[in-house]
Amino acid sequence: MAERVYGEKVNIDTVNTISFYNQRAKTIKNREQEYTTVLLGDQDPEYAVKWDEYEKGFVLPKLMLNRNKVVLDLGCGMGRLADAVSDKVKEYYGVDFSSEMIAVAKQNVRNNHCHFYTMSIVDALSDPKITARKYDLVLMAGVSMYINEDELKESYRLLRNLVNKDSLFYFEESVGKIERLTLNHIWSEDLQDYYGAIYRTREEYKSLIDEYINGVEYIEEGYMNFLDKEEQTETSHWYALLQYKGE
């Protein structure tokens, strides 16, 4: 199969993706900037710092965090967002499919009210460790691009069962500007590794959310192109902040 697939819905090998992030987590101590572990940009470490600062500064004030909120972070990685929100909320639950990333998160964020689990997102949304409570805020930042279509639909559908009326969702993803683009185990000179991801379009994400989560209202959504790189002409960053109103 071609390494770059345009327009078509094809699956990526999630086993390779897990291995990719496990290996990156193991090298975190050797990195000039640890956020490149999850935000990539290995050849420009300062980009990861700028992106992290920009996203947190842009999004966190919109999340209405307080000590009564319970947060679910799906695809939490090394705890980048946990570090920013955990001391402002009642409880935080982070899930990631990379055991090595979860190990780093547990080292980085040691609050007693933070809980980290190694699971795929679709498994987590059916696991009693996660389903035992409702959440006031669900974060899915930079993770849907690593989930194949059927599993993503099921994950979005299951999310409805875990939120309260008026709960918030924050989504952020790398997206195809013009059309869907799948990188199918492609060699990256910047990362010095094989890489796979699905860059759905903004419209595709909105359609999936509307159909499978259902009952949400958009507070705001759009492109986060402040730090888009000139050489990445086919992709951008998209975000959405939504509130669950019930079916």
List each model region and its residues.
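Hydrophobic adenine-recognition pocket in adenosine-nucleotide-binding enzymes
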Residues: 143
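Conserved helix-to-beta-strand junction in the class I
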Residues: 161-163
